[in-house]
Amino acid sequence: MVQIWQMEPYPCGDPRLPHHLFPPKKITPDELSKRTGTLYWKLDTLDQVALAKRLTTLKLEHNFKKEDIFTLDAETTANFDDKIEELFEESSVPFEQARMIIEGSAYYDVEDKNGQWVRIFCEYGDLILIPSNTCFRFTTTPKNFVKMRRFYKEEEGN
């Protein structure tokens, strides 16, 4: 089951740690959608037909024309710490972001309508869709490894 929570307002230290509020404030996928517009699916990766259908539907409904595989690994990524720092910078883009975790795990942080950060723990089989013009950031977990499929609209160009 997916883990989603409201983050502490001023996280300090390693961004790869959970940064829960105390006491933790868990959020459901429905609440995530209402607060941020972000959509979440847990894909059945063992059912290749259902998986292909879900991804085809995603691509058609959201006009994703291209995709790639992105790997972030402390053992093989050059300047890993710099890359983590770069990816954890808040950003907002004018197009939707779709990501599916195919190995490892990562955190996606999405800013809600009230300026509070919501953290999504994404692992194997998780697919998220972050709406356009939504502030977000990304980091690995302390395991320092994630491999994902990224889906793009044609005009994005990476």
Curated annotation (Swiss-Prot):
Catalysis: reaction(s): 1,2-dihydroxy-5-(methylsulfanyl)pent-1-en-3-one + O2 = 4-methylsulfanyl-2-oxobutanoate + formate + 2 H(+); 1,2-dihydroxy-5-(methylsulfanyl)pent-1-en-3-one + O2 = 3-(methylsulfanyl)propanoate + CO + formate + 2 H(+)
Class of this enzyme: oxidoreductase
Bound cofactor: record note:
Binds either 1 Fe or Ni cation per monomer. Iron-binding promotes an acireductone dioxygenase reaction producing 2-keto-4-methylthiobutyrate, while nickel-binding promotes an acireductone dioxygenase reaction producing 3-(methylsulfanyl)propanoate.
Give me any GO biological process, just one. Answer: methionine metabolic process
What cofactor does this chain's UniProt record say it requires?
Answer: Fe(2+); Ni(2+)
Q: Which domain of life is it from?
A: Eukaryota
Q: In which pathway does it act?
A: Amino-acid biosynthesis; L-methionine biosynthesis via salvage pathway; L-methionine from S-methyl-5-thio-alpha-D-ribose 1-phosphate: step 5/6
SUPFAM superfamilies of this UniProt entry?
A: RmlC-like cupins
Give GO MF terms, alphabetically: acireductone dioxygenase (Ni2+-requiring) activity; acireductone dioxygenase [iron(II)-requiring] activity
State the compartments where it is located. Cytoplasm; Nucleus
Similarity comment: family membership:
Belongs to the acireductone dioxygenase (ARD) family.
Per the entry, what this protein does is: Catalyzes 2 different reactions between oxygen and the acireductone 1,2-dihydroxy-3-keto-5-methylthiopentene (DHK-MTPene) depending upon the metal bound in the active site. Fe-containing acireductone dioxygenase (Fe-ARD) produces formate and 2-keto-4-methylthiobutyrate (KMTB), the alpha-ketoacid precursor of methionine in the methionine recycle pathway. Ni-containing acireductone dioxygenase (Ni-ARD) produces methylthiopropionate, carbon monoxide and formate, and does not lie on the methionine recycle pathway.
Query: What protein does this entry describe?
Result: Acireductone dioxygenase 3
Q: Which organism is it from?
A: Caenorhabditis briggsae
| Lineage, broadest ranks | Eukaryota, Metazoa, Ecdysozoa, Nematoda, Chromadorea
